[in-house]
Amino acid sequence: MKLLKLPADQAWKHVFEFVKKTSFCKSIGSKAITYQLKYIENQIHFNCLTRNDGNDEIVSKEMFIEFYESILKIETVNTNTIKTLVPNSLYRMRSPMIALLKACGLLQNS
């Protein structure tokens, strides 16, 4: 999949608008995982019963921008190709973050 090359702040605004309108996104892998989404005080909260004991996983604006900027330079984006690029603090969030980027249109099929 190809990532739209937007400035990180603009990408955050795009994701924010998507989460305001939509309360979920689906995983892109073979497992049919649905992530519940909430936007609370400049953070995106992901929730899925099969991850993190059903507790919210939280990505702040700063974390999102760090994640987005770390994957901007590669041609093909998926959970495997970004393994070495994503900061350690966001490594576990690769799958829900890619699902969110795909759902909001920032990540498109090649």
Set out the residue ranges of the language-model regions.
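Long, low-complexity, charged/polar intrinsically disordered regions in eukaryotic proteins
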Residues: M1-E62
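Generic structural signal of hydrophobic/aromatic residues within well-ordered alpha-helices
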Residues: A11-V19, F64-I71, I82, M97
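Surface-exposed polar/charged interaction patches
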Residues: F18-C25, S70, I74-V77, C104
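Generic serine detector
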Residues: S23, S27-S30, S60, S70, ...
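Acidic, aromatic-enriched beta-alpha/helix-loop junctions
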Residues: L49-I82
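Short, compact, well-ordered microdomains
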Residues: K73-S110
